[in-house]
Amino acid sequence: MEWMRSRVGTLGLWVRLLLAVFLLGVYQAYPIPDSSPLLQFGGQVRQRYLYTDDDQDTEAHLEIREDGTVVGAAHRSPESLLELKALKPGVIQILGVKASRFLCQQPDGALYGSPHFDPEACSFRELLLEDGYNVYQSEAHGLPLRLPQKDSPNQDATSWGPVRFLPMPGLLHEPQDQAGFLPPEPPDVGSSDPLSMVEPLQGRSPSYAS
């Protein structure tokens, strides 16, 4: 009788062990959701145009040029396409795609584009507003991101108020139409030769030619 209890106990231990192994395998079969706060925008890198109409001479897009100057452009351009990358929760870096320069800010508030990333000068806090606009502020200096103004270039930066920017989606590589290339036509399902394997290829895309 004692032998029977011992055997039953051993069998129960093996059943529990096998059940634990099975449940562990099922758990590992499912991907663990990434709860990193750096992915709050669906990805660490966003491609955007930063547009502002706050307290500027004209409506403008933030533009980083290859010589390192930062200006406001009335229209979108390759120089105004930016990459916004999360560094930590609420803090980002801004890179001009064409110029390959990081947006940075001096202690006096002046903006410039640097070929090298300086965590102190090139890190910005990003505050999301309810109206869809964002406010950016230097993490090190606490000064708001603001495009240079022609009428008051020497204005005291400490008197600047927050400027709203509207992040407008942009593509790193805009699709371009290829001249002289026609997309392939769908097969004619009503034909006895829907894939044109027998009939001569007349007026079809060159991609169908052998």
UniProtKB/Swiss-Prot annotation:
Subcellular location: Secreted
Major location category of this protein: secreted
One Gene Ontology cellular component: extracellular space
Gene Ontology BP term (one): positive regulation of D-glucose import
Keyword Isomerase assigned: no
Cysteines paired by S-S bonds: none
SMART domains: FGF (SM00442)
Pfam family, one: FGF
One term of GO molecular function: growth factor activity
Keyword Secreted included in the entry's annotation: yes
Coiled-coil regions listed: none
Organism superkingdom: Eukaryota
Tissue distribution: Most abundantly expressed in the liver, also expressed in the thymus at lower levels. Expressed in skeletal muscle (at protein level). Secreted in plasma (at protein level).
Gene3D superfamilies: 2.80.10.50
InterPro entries from the UniProt entry: FGF15/19/21, Fibroblast_GF_fam, IL1/FGF
Record-stated family: Belongs to the heparin-binding growth factors family.
Subunit structure: Interacts (via C-terminus) with KLB; this interaction is direct. Interacts with FGFR4.
Purpose of the protein: Stimulates glucose uptake in differentiated adipocytes via the induction of glucose transporter SLC2A1/GLUT1 expression (but not SLC2A4/GLUT4 expression). Activity probably requires the presence of KLB. Regulates systemic glucose homeostasis and insulin sensitivity.
Protein name as it appears in the record: Fibroblast growth factor 21
Native species: Mus musculus (Mouse)
Gene behind the chain: Fgf21
